Amino acid sequence: MWRTPASTGPLRQDRQMFFHATLARSFINALSVRGDDDAVDRLNYYYTPLILAVCCLVISAKQYGGTPIECWVNPHSRESMEEYIESYCWIQNTYWIPMYENVPDDHTAREEKQIGYYQWVPFILIAEALMFSLPCIFWRLCSFQSGLNIQTLINAACDGQALLDASDRQKAVEAITTNFVDNLDLQSPNGRIRARGWIARIKFSRFLSGQCLSILHSFTKLLYSMNVVAQFLILNACLKSSDFLFFGFQVLNDIWAGRPWTETGHFPRVTLCDFEVRYLANLNRYTVQCALLINIINEKVFAFLWCWYMILAIITTCSFIYWIANSFIHSEKVDYVMKFIQIAESSEFKKLQKFEKDATVERLYTVIAFAPHLLDTFVSDFLKSDGVLMLRMISNHAGDMIVVQLVRNLWQEFRERNWREFEEHEEMKDVEMRRIHGGERIVISNPGQTKSFL
């Protein structure tokens, strides 16, 4: 017995729905949330694909499990013929002519008004989800090739911050500091650790030394911003529209003005379909009117996605500008590190007051006031752009307190490596303080005794 394409539909529809669900679930699970990103990155590579997957499942349920199209045929036609016409019109595309216009006799004019996107909406959404994840994949591959263990540092910092015992937490910070310093040494061509990977070799150039990770991170942010803009262009092409950039404004304006879809043509519900039937060696052409029920859902989905993409574009662009400024403007990096230095100094001063209540505690004068270039050297030559970037990432995920302890240890490491210059400026500081106090003998707390890292 001859079977129409629609008669084999249930099994095929179940397989297609299972394919879409499995593909979306596997894709999302492969991009798990990690610590080497921020909230804006997660909105792009994790939550947006999740939203697109949900939209894909909703549309697929209607498209493959429901009735996406219904066509009005001759009441005397057999049921098999009705199913055939609906299957044909679904596959072959339909076209929209406003009710107040006459249907053109020219078939070429009809083809120019064809609507051919509704069958491909689930695939379009999956492709968009993949595109949103590409910058994340690029970042993870390149950061791994750079040889820097960012994820390990952030995970260790989060675990260390969760420790309640002070001694255990201090040991954890010391271990993180050692790992951090090793990563910093890797930024120099003369580092103790041999670089592996093509990115690690490229970054040893004079220009990229200590900035490779920051450049990769900023470029990834740029990719996120460019991707959101590209989504509007892709939807313009898929929907055969030149104004999807303003689609949301148009829909809201139509709703406000009370204009129905029959006038605007946005995701039309009623369309026309031409098909040919060979009967007794003659080719007969017919036109039927069809109801695209799937377009009711498509309109709501794309209106929501337009609003989401617009919000995401603004947030992602602001995030890109923020990270560019913080990664490459020297004063921003110095101010950021100085903030933690001041917090650590204040903490040490309060501890000294607490344990020496009967003693006269002088203000802890730092060498930075007498040699500000040391702080610049600490940021530009020791931490470099990549070190400051890693501090920011650790702060975003583990909190500021562990970064305070980490900066204190890093400053101590910097002092040990530049002890001659520090001793010279310590002597200059003592002379200056005696001059300020009129030659009186001023006792300045020894950094080693007061545990001050400055």
From Swiss-Prot:
It is found in: Cell membrane; Cell junction, Gap junction. One of its GO terms (molecular function) is gap junction channel activity. It is a multi-pass membrane protein. The keyword Transport applies. The keyword Acetylation does not apply. It comes from the Eukaryota. GO terms for cellular component: gap junction; neuronal cell body membrane; plasma membrane. Residues 1-48, 140-214, 322-454 are cytoplasmic. Belongs to the pannexin family. Structural component of the gap junctions that specifically coordinates left-right asymmetry in the developing nervous system. Acts by forming gap junction network linking embryonic neurons and providing electrical coupling between cells, leading to promote or inhibit AWC signaling. Required for the left and right AWC olfactory neurons to establish asymmetric patterns of gene expression during embryogenesis. Acts autonomously. This is Innexin-19.
